[in-house]
Amino acid sequence: MEDVKLAVDTGVDGVDVVIGTSSYLRQFSHGKSIEEIIELAQTVIEYLTKQNVEVRFSTEDSLRSNPEDLFRVYEAVDKMGVHRVGVADTVGIGTPRQIYELVKELRSRVKADIEFHGHNDTGCAIANAFAALEAGATHVDTSVLGIGERNGITPLGGFIARMYAVNPALVAKYHLPLLMHLDQAVARLVNVDIPFNNYITGFAAFTHKAGIHAKAVLNNPSTYEILKPEDFGLHRYIHIANRLTGWNAIRHRADQLGLQLSDEEIRRITEQIKAMADTQQLTLDEVDRLLYTHEQAVNGNVETKTITDQPVHLDV
């Protein structure tokens, strides 16, 4: 109770009460029985409901708790008047199906809002969070870049991507271009890198490299993109300086540079790029110089222009 009173004294408008209900936490953490948990919850909740604050009660390690014990606790605190109950997959053991079934059953038993908190130890945090929403949860815990204990929790960017892919209207109220700035700010403050394959904000998120992909994306980006980078204030990038590049991507680059090269010449240049990339790392500048060299050989001297500040950004 001392911690609860201290929290209220700070002037907060909501208090989150958490206690473990699994046999692991009951035996090796706080040592309380289910009956004692309910008694303690009643003491705390009765006090909080008189303080004009929002009350959230969450079990910890919900997925490894005995279902009968779990629902007994939830139904008890719901009757006590909590505003929200929380389901916590504390060790990331749950699967989307398990989360869906648990939250659906809980939804049928309590009137309070339902919040889901999922850890990512087994890589299911995003899928589990969305399954919880589908089953009737009203709130989902996320963190920027998924930062949290061990492997972290549901990442904000990944969850935004999941909802956007289902229906962009689900995230229409958010200013999506801020996501990149938010990820960058947090990464800088905690001294970590944004993973190259991070949802939305990783540098590879909208990068296309293989020739077959590049050709299709040039024709219609939806062939290999479920998210529209422009909706997040970003651009797609066709990476052409590699051995997997295709002639369609090289053609697009030549057109960007204003070069007049036939398809046969473009195909020949593409094969040369592939061969060079097998033995050395190429830069976009080197590819451009190769294109200009061929242009000069075919059509005479031409004035070169540099657009490497905007390398193959495609808004198509």
Task: State each model region's role.
Residues 1, 22, 62, 92, ...:
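Short, glycine-/Ser/Thr-/acidic-enriched flexible segments
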Residues 1-114, 129-137:
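Alpha/beta enzyme core
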Residues 8-15, 23, 41, 45-52, ...:
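Structural signal for hydrophobic packing residues in well-ordered secondary-structure cores
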Residues 20, 61, 90, 120, ...:
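Residue-level "edge-of-site" marker
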Residues 23-24, 64-65, 93-94, 123, ...:
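Short secondary-structure capping/turn micro-motifs that flank functional sites
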Residues 31, 35-38, 42, 67, ...:
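Electropositive phosphate-/nucleotide-binding environments in soluble metabolic enzymes
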Residues 94, 98-225:
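Catalytic alpha/beta core domains of metabolic enzymes, predominantly
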Residues 168-316:
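A mid-to-C-terminal "edge-of-domain" accessory segment
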